[in-house]
């Protein structure tokens, strides 16, 4: 077993029962191993595409095979693959590279796929001109609490063409005419993972006596 790469002269000496010897020499070339390495998208939310970039190097040959294992039962032989995970979680990703001397090396890294927040809200039914209160009841996904982010942004669209609400989880708005309005809320957590939800808010017409 050679501990270093290089060119070695191997000698085989054989001796028979009469003490006679013979020998043979051969040149043994020990190549350096390729060094597997890769990078990937920093923050990945469920549904995002994860891009992997091969950073492997080899000083004594050419890498000609890439074996990726994404840790969820899916694989690829592309140099720079991409993958979409079906579930949040922590995945062990491996890249094994092989060069034209059949030398191999493996790199292993952890990829975290974060869950998107669960978006929801409530609203009071009011009459025209009154103020309705919109309350975000959105939460982080408790099933994946160890990797889920904390919601820190709320984007409201009141559905009446009068712009967007302030970045608050509880907000008030007055509608100038009756009807159902489709209100949209987008919540975003500290990792940039977001979810959108829409629901109807009802504004009643005034009764004229």
Residue ranges of model-derived segments:
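Short, exposed coil/turn segments at beta-strand boundaries within extracellular/luminal domains
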Residues: 17-23, 75, 101-106, 164-165, ...
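C-terminal edge beta-strand
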Residues: 24-29, 107-112, 197-203
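Short beta-strand segments of immunoglobulin-like
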Residues: 39-44, 121-127
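A short beta-strand segment in extracellular, disulfide-stabilized domains
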Residues: 48-58, 130-144
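Conserved small/polar residues in nucleotide/adenosyl-binding loops
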Residues: 207-209
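Surface-exposed, flexible coil segments in extracellular/virion-facing regions
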Residues: 1, 60-84, 147-173
């Amino acid at each position: 077993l050679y501990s270093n790469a290089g060119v070695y002269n191997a000698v085989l000496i054989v001796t028979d029962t009469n003490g006679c010897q013979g020998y043979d020499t051969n040149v043994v070339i020990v190549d350096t191993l390729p060094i597997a390495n890769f990078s990937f998208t920093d923050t990945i939310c469920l549904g995002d595409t994860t891009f992997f970039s091969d950073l492997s190097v080899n000083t004594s040959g050419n890498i000609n095979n890439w074996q990726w294992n994404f840790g969820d039962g899916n694989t690829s032989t592309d140099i720079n693959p991409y993958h979409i995970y079906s579930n949040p979680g922590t995945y062990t990703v491996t890249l094994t590279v092989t060069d034209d001397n059949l030398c191999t090396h493996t790199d292993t890294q952890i990829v975290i796929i974060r869950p998107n927040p669960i978006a929801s809200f409530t609203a009071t039914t009011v009459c025209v001109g009154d103020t309705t209160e919109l309350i975000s009841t959105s939460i982080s996904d408790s099933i994946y609490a160890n990797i889920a982010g904390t919601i820190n942004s709320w984007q409201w669209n009141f559905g009446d063409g009068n712009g967007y609400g302030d970045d608050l989880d509880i907000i008030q708005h007055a509608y100038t005419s009756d009807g159902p309005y489709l209100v949209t809320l987008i919540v975003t957590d500290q990792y940039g993972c977001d979810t959108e939800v829409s629901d109807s808010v009802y504004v009643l017409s005034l009764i004229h006596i």
